[in-house]
Amino acid sequence: PEPDINFDVGSGTQAEQTAAIMIHYEKLLLENPSNLCLVVGDVTSSMACAITAQKLCIPVAHVEAGIRSGDWSMPEEINRMVTDSITNYFFTTSEIATENLRRASVTDDRIFFVGNTMIDTLLCNMERLCPPSFWNEFELEVGQYIVLTLHRPGNVDAIDAFKKMLLTIGRQTRKLPVIFPVHPRTAKTLSNLKG
C-alpha cells in the first residue's frame, strides 16, 4: 500500500536528506501533535525523525535498537548511535543488542526484547509469496541460486574495489545463477565500469 504521507526527499547527501526529513517531519508534528515517535532500524529517516521529535519534547521508541557494527564509516552506524543516544524506549532484536544498550548505561526498564520483526513479518507472510516472473525463465531451483545485494557506499563507490569484488563473486559462484537486484547507487557505479 501507498504511505499516508510521503516526504518525497529523494536522494542527496546524508546532510541534505537529514535536513529535508527534519523540516518535513517537524511541520507534520506541529500540525498533528503526537504522544510518541516510533522509528525503525538504522536509516537516515529514523535518526532525523528521532532528533526532531526530541526537540519537540516527544518521546522516541526505537525498534531494532542496540545493533552495532563498530564501523563508523557506515552511515547506518552513525544513525544507530545517534538514534539510540536520544531514545526513551528501546525495542531490541537480540540479546547482543540488549547487552550493547546495557553497556551504554541504558536501564533494563527501558529495554524491551521483541525479536527480529523483519523475520517475523516475513514468516507471517510466507503463504502470500510466489515465485518471481523470472523463476521459470531461468529454471531456478530452491537452494540452487544466490541473491546478491550490493549498495553500501563502502562496497560500491570505489570502482576498482567494486570491480575486484564482482570478479571474485563471479569466480566463486560459477555453478550457481546469481540474482542481482541492482540498487540505483550500484547502477551508477556499474555504468562507470562499462565506460
Regions found by a protein language model. Name each.
Residues P1, C130-G195:
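Donor-nucleotide binding loops and adjacent catalytic segments primarily
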Residues P1, K55-C57, E77-M81, D108-D109, ...:
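Short, hinge-like loop/turn segments at secondary-structure boundaries
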Residues I5-S105:
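Active-site and donor-binding regions of nucleotide-sugar-utilizing enzymes
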Residues V9, I86-D160:
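A nucleotide-sugar donor-handling region in carbohydrate enzymes
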Residues E26-L30, L123, W135, G170:
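Generic structural signal for well-ordered alpha-helical scaffold segments
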Residues M47-A48, N100, T121, K188-L190:
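Phosphate- and divalent-cation-binding pockets in alpha/beta enzyme and binding domains
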Residues P59, R110, P177-V178:
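Residues at the starts of beta-strands that form the adenosine-phosphate
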